[in-house]
Amino acid sequence: MPIKLLMPALSPTMTEGNLARWLKKEGDKINPGEVIAEIETDKATMEVEAVDEGTLAKIIIPQGSQNVPVNSLIAVLIEEGEELSGIEEFIAKNNSNSPKKEEISKPAETIAPQNVKEENITTASDQNNIKVFASPLAKRLAKIQNVRIEEIKGSGPHGRIIKQDVLSHKGGSKALSNKIVSRNPEEYRLAPNNNIRKIIAKRLLESKQTVPHFYLSIECNVDKLLDIREDINKSFGDDKSAKISVNDFIILAVAKALQEVPNANASWGDDAIRYYNNVDISVAVAIENGLVTPIIRNADQKNIVDLSSEMKGLIKKARENKLTPEEFQGGGFTISNLGMYGIKNFNAIINPPQSCIMGVGSSSKRAIVKNDQISIATIMDVTLSADHRVVDGAVGAEFLAAFKRFIESPALMLLYTR
């Protein structure tokens, strides 16, 4: 008997998703555990594994389809030796939960305005109503070149004018070379927004419109941190996979500071403020389609080596679109680090419903005054963005002071555990 493949629910709140890509085609043999498709939710693109064994007999929902309801019939498997003759009847009987064709968006297409192949023939008319057959690109080049296109003889099928005809037209090549070298005929390209980009836009717009942000900045001397990091990494020898990053120390310092200042580990609710009992830290990670924030849970209870290893694993999964909902949903505080891009400081946008996000800038050598003497130190800028409904200025300042103490004296946070 044919086996139904249904649109899976990849999180408790998921009601629909996009079928981004089929990794198998009709006629392919499927084994349990094989990845057969990629489903795009409002948070991430996730792989779907087969549960049953069989042959992919019919793909019902094509790749690129959007807004496919959960539990819709997306494909059908048949068992070994089973005939295809009754497959259409089976689909007709079992496709009642599937969305109607008009309810599912067509696969997203890449739109490139004015970037039309020369084979696409269009008809143009001049002021004297003389019909001219030319490709859109040829017409645009003729306009840039300031040449009357009806004066150009076409060499394409049925006498149509193509790009090369415009380029080789007498008096045209020189003018064109002077004008088009520094300007692309296609003014722009359009990239359809995927679900990840849409949800980022929605949440950040909501944050800036509804959350009263305020910002606190501080400078941290990271010379001791860099020294102790170097000593730790030397102990790993040539094992680069075990190396501790500056960001690992930042995560641990934030965790210890939240342990000391729990009022910064909170979120706003209309009826009550939630003060979190666990220190779960979201870390912003750039991916091809946008941004995700995997979570280090109970970060205050972990040593620097374990925390670093866990963070590396989460980053790898994030960039491979393999994070599970439990690994990126929740969290009480976010860290966004742009220091590796040379950004000195920035004001990050709060990730609702959290009340705080800390933007970390680059480290650089600067002159400082110490004991009335000018000396050189490695300084890192950090900026706390906080929700003033939850975090008062004094609480934000207290948190940054605790963070600064841990980051400037890293031995404290390496020893300071519950």
Curated annotation (Swiss-Prot):
Subunit structure of this chain's protein: Forms a 24-polypeptide structural core with octahedral symmetry.
What's this protein's name? Dihydrolipoyllysine-residue acetyltransferase component of pyruvate dehydrogenase complex
Q: Which UniProt keywords apply?
A: Acyltransferase, Lipoyl, Transferase
Instruction: List the PANTHER family hit by this protein, alphabetically.
Output: DIHYDROLIPOAMIDE ACETYL/SUCCINYL-TRANSFERASE-RELATED (PTHR23151), DIHYDROLIPOYLLYSINE-RESIDUE ACETYLTRANSFERASE COMPONENT OF PYRUVATE DEHYDROGENASE COMPLEX, MITOCHONDRIAL-RELATED (PTHR23151:SF90)
* Residue numbers of N6-lipoyllysine PTMs: K43
Relay the cofactor remark from the entry: Binds 1 lipoyl cofactor covalently.
The record places domain Lipoyl-binding at 2-78
Q: What does this protein do?
A: The pyruvate dehydrogenase complex catalyzes the overall conversion of pyruvate to acetyl-CoA and CO(2). It contains multiple copies of three enzymatic components: pyruvate dehydrogenase (E1), dihydrolipoamide acetyltransferase (E2) and lipoamide dehydrogenase (E3).
Family per similarity comment: Belongs to the 2-oxoacid dehydrogenase family.
GO terms for MF:
dihydrolipoyllysine-residue acetyltransferase activity
Q: From what superkingdom does this record's organism come? A: Bacteria
Task: Give the source species.
Answer: Rickettsia bellii (strain RML369-C)
Q: What residues make up the catalytic site?
A: H388
* Entry cofactors: (R)-lipoate
Q: Which GO CC annotations does the UniProt entry carry?
A: pyruvate dehydrogenase complex
Query: A GO term (biological process) for this protein?
Result: pyruvate decarboxylation to acetyl-CoA
Residue ranges occupied by any Peripheral subunit-binding (PSBD) domain in the UniProt entry: 133-170
**Reaction catalysed by this enzyme:** N(6)-[(R)-dihydrolipoyl]-L-lysyl-[protein] + acetyl-CoA = N(6)-[(R)-S(8)-acetyldihydrolipoyl]-L-lysyl-[protein] + CoA
E.C. number: 2.3.1.12
